[in-house]
Amino acid sequence: MIKAVYGDYQPLAAPGAIIQGPHYRFTILTSRLIRAEYSPTGTFYDGQTQTVLNRDFPVPHYEIREREDLLEIITDHVLIQYDKQAFSREGLVFKLRGYFSIYHSDWHYGDPIQDLGGTAQTLDHANGAVPLERGLMSRFGFSVLDDSQSLQLTQDGWYQVKQGNSQDFYYFGYGHDYRACLADFYRLTGPQPLLPKYALGNWWSRFYRYSEATYRQLIERFEAEGLPFTVAVIDMDWHVVSVPPQYGSGWTGYTWNEELFPDPAGFMAWLHQHGLRITLNVHPADGVRPFESMYQQMAQELGLDWEGGEYVVFDPTSPRFLEAYFKHLHHPKEEQGVDFWWIDWQQGQTVKGVDPLWVLNHYHYHDIQARGPQGITFSRYAGPGSHRYPVGFSGDSHMTWESLDFQPYFTATASNIGYGWWSHDIGGHIFGYRDNELALRWYQLGVFSPIMRLHSSSSEFLGKEPWRYPEPYASSMKDYLRLRHRLLPYLYTMNYRAAYQAQPLIEPLYYQHPEEEAAYEIANQYYFGSQIMVMPLTQPRHKGSLCSRFDGWLPEGTWYDIQTGLRYSGGRSLSIYRPLERMGLFAKAGAILPLSGEDGTDNSLANPSVLAIKVFTGADGHFDLVEEAETATDTLAGTAFLTTGLTFVDGKVFKLEPQGTGLRTYELTFVGACLTDLELAGQGRLVDVSHNDQGDSLVRLEADGPVTLSFKQAPRDSQQVRLDVIFSYIEQAQMENQAKDQIWALVKKDMPLAYKMLELQGLGLDREVIEPVIELLVTEP
């Protein structure tokens, strides 16, 4: 029997949390999370489901008021009124206590829920927006998760279709405390697993007829260009696709195409030697047919007439089939070198009540994890609870601006159902058109997405290799690939946060700013971990300004443009304008951003010997960097962690508190500040103190234990930085030369900012040409 058991979770609720009658049962999991069940037969299910694993919560305070025809349950946050009959709109109401709206805080059973959206199974063939399934977050303060039709998990590791027509749902009444809502959802359903570090780097993927030789040439070209990739995705042409016509299409296959890959084990060993993990694409729907190399063994094991050519039908309801499926189709290839599988299921349900996609995700993830903690799956979303099976494959989107424009919102909103590790076809997969700017903007979004996976279709004209684009696109693409790899220390820490602190990498703005209208109105802006806010560019640039615009919002406080170091005042809406090579990346004063101090040109996953730390001055800050211990291996013992505490007290000290990392070089950039009178105490030494072109202090030190850097701090002079950025913009803008001279003269003119802005607007030039200058003028000194 396949063993897919969640033994670490307790599906039985505490007896004190249960209120039960002949046909109903309420379980008060928290004061804001209530399970409600109605069973015509009076039987209730206490086991795990495909969505829910754990109901072992501390019993909250609640009160009961009861008479013959009415049950009232009162918690600190919710009032439930129930007539003790079959659930109905008139007989069951949940009332959220506290003001969220005049009348929308009451939910009558069966009423539609107005939530903020969740995610969707796929973006296959999407050219822009697609409808989203339900999420947990709502401006009205409540949502409902219906578990009535979920598969039931059995203690022997299998599943069963639920019998009967009982109702079983979970009411979430968390108001606008969205993070608490998500944390309790993870407690109920299980957390997002920790991803192996390799999954956070750059993935190369293409639906293309590679051979072993051409794939090696590609990887060697990446290495020569200094482009770091950590995952090699090999699409379906790894297996035989030209099959005898009596067997139908070659979409499903498990036999290596030895014309293209004569030595699969040697090829994959070579990829491993070059620092790449490997995934193969599989379409399981057609089962195993007689032309497959492993057909006879598998058919014999299943008792089929292999001599007569009886097909091995794909049957997700059969434990025997799945045992043989892994034993004969997958494990041998994993022994050859496959690290994980891309499960490309595109069909619907084959048996009533059973979604084969969920079955594949569930058992593939458990199977690969049983072979070591570095395994993952790569597959489409299969409903609530799918966050337990990362990574998500969003499908075959169109290569259009419309598709790009939808992806930031789609990715952030998926957090509303706990689904934090989407992988998109960066650059788009099919149809659409060639647009160099679109390709670069998609690269940029990919770097600040959960997973950075380039992909395209088989057309000879659709390759995403940077060298297939002209300058300046190619150089910028290369820079962003290297930046993604340099972000690994930060990304791994956020990966740890997602797994152990119930906060996904990407969060919509309203998670941190639930009472701000702008946080709901600006769909594409999001937080990328705890230290970065992203305004992605998803519209073509203006022909005159050569900049793309994003209409965004900065929360209260002081914010820095991470790429220029310019400082912005928050608490306002604004339009930002960025040339091709830059995007909207902001860090708040007090943010601490760790990066690899190496140049990002090789794909090493070792903890960097040089750590580059950007400290955004103007407020105190703290960041706990989490890294894998160098001794961590692919064993069932799991992963060991190293923590480095980074603390900044504005204007006074910076503290480094490494634990077990050994001697390391640290390159500190104090963005927005000039430091003097530096003194270092502790287990380290100052190596060098200098300044960058923006006037920020750069401090290089070595430490093998805790150190404290004391200093005096003064704000840098940002005026020249601002002028340099404005000059660069005006120089490249496509406009009349006389207009450039007029703009530059006004920029340098000594006059109040308000008058300067009025005069610029009075020049009669296109708004899209003038507004970038005004944006830069109003940055803080």
Residue ranges and their predicted role:
Residues 4, 29-68:
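A low-complexity, Ser/Thr/Gly/Pro-enriched, surface-exposed linker/loop concept
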Residues 74-92:
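Hydrophobic or amphipathic alpha-helical targeting/insertion segments
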Residues 2-5, 9-10, 80, 92-582, ...:
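Catalytic-domain carbohydrate-binding cleft regions of carbohydrate-active enzymes
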Residues 589-683, 712-781:
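Accessory, solvent-exposed terminal regions and/or long lumenal/extracellular loops of proteins
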Residues 35-37, 41, 542-555, 659-676:
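Surface-exposed beta-strand/loop patches in extracellular or lumenal glycoproteins
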